[in-house]
């Protein structure tokens, strides 16, 4: 796991590492992490130490000083950094090591970086995925499955707070976009 500055870090780790969690995924476990963090984003700077402590103390996750060391010791990687700007640099050593990769929102800090991440992964034949969990919500999936008939028009609302270092809807806009795309059949 790369970037320990979001509440997704302990949440995903609990799902994977805790057999008592109702959503537990057997066979997968978070075993290593690279702290990361962005000093110029308060939601990163102010939370990274606490989430890092939780991973180490509650889940016994080993911290690595570099991403290159981390990828030598894991089978797959989650990039969880709340700041999309370092995602390309963080993804490069993961892709070079041929490790399957999930990138949490935002996928990158710019369209250029997002396209480069996907290009590198495709070229290296590395599985890469990024998604909003709202795509898999019960109501969204029911509508996609035809519960109300064929969808010909839809509007979506969702959290979409803005962040000064990220353009447009990069920060949270994926939630509404994914819900909309899902019910419209894409």
Predicted regions and their residues:
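Contiguous beta-strand/loop segments that form the cofactor/metal-binding neighborhood of enzyme cores
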Residues: 165-167, 171-186
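A structural signal for well-ordered alpha-helical segments within the folded catalytic domains
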Residues: 6-10, 88, 115, 137, ...
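Hydrophobic residues in well-ordered beta-strands that form the structural core
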Residues: 65, 103, 128-130
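A contiguous active-site-proximal alpha/beta segment in oxidoreductase catalytic domains
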Residues: 107-166, 176
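N-terminal glycine-/serine-/threonine-rich beta1-alpha1-beta2 phosphate-ribose binding loop
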Residues: 1-97, 122-123
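Active-site phosphate/pyrophosphate- and oxyanion-stabilizing loops and adjacent acidic/basic residues
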Residues: 53, 141, 177-181
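Short helix/strand-capping hinge loops at secondary-structure junctions
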Residues: 98-100, 105-106
């Amino acid at each position: 796991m790369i970037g320990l500055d979001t509440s997704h870090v302990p949440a995903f780790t609990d799902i994977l590492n805790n057999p008592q969690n109702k959503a537990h995924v057997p066979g997968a476990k978070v075993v290593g992490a690279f702290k990361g963090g962005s000093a110029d984003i308060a939601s990163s700077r102010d939370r990274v130490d606490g989430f890092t402590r939780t991973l180490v103390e509650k889940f016994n996750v080993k911290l690595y000083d570099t991403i290159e060391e981390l990828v030598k010791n894991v089978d797959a990687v989650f990039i969880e950094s709340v700041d999309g700007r370092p995602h390309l640099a963080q993804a490069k050593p993961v892709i070079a090591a041929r490790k399957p990769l999930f990138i949490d929102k935002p996928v990158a800090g710019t369209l250029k970086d997002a396209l480069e991440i996907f290009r590198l992964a495709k070229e290296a034949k590395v599985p890469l995925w990024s998604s909003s969990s709202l795509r898999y919500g019960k109501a969204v999936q029911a509508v996609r499955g035809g519960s109300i008939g064929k969808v010909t028009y839809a509007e979506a609302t969702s959290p979409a707070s803005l962040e000064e270092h990220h353009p447009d809807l990069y920060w949270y806009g994926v939630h509404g976009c994914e819900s909309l795309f899902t019910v419209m059949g894409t």
